[in-house]
């Protein structure tokens, strides 16, 4: 998970929590001259062989005390995390995936030199090394004021990063096997407001009745626009879809039945998707 944000496995349990690469440059999308901070994880991915294994053995001995009385499964989940961490430290693949310096200047220019382009390229490297799910958080779209300046600043970097990713995946023969999803949480109000207190420059507020999502790759029938709003982008007037439909489509592309139910730790059945259907015409 590139950048911290809204993450966590919730009722799936801690064994499914993401590995987070906590960088502090996520608000610098529009500053292409910003010197990119190298991932701190690179400094720790040094092979130390016997030293690491010795620490693991000591930890296992200490954990056994709690393991005998653990009823929640948290120790088992922690075991999985620890093993994954050891594998990362001892494997050169992890270090290689995070090391953007191995890429050519031309390719880095294709994605854009700002942090968003940098971490989108890193996402491709992770997928190339076998990571099955990567999230790149590109925040700071909550423009209740100064929306014109904000969008003019950020949209070019988003456009370049996404376009560069799709072009790169296509050239490497990875696009048909990689689903790219670009989306947020909701849309913005059709009408401008007068800005926020202390910042009297127009912006837009939260709007749940309409938004846009980009789906690319994954073997989808792309080059289409599915659905439409009225001329003011207030509400759908054709082919209205819901977030559950987007989720059902993603699960279907991944080969997971969206109608699946699973049990949480309390034994309660939890549906993957509530009433959603995969989007017709793009599968």
Language-model features: locations:
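Ligand-binding pockets and gating/stacking loops
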Residues: 1-283
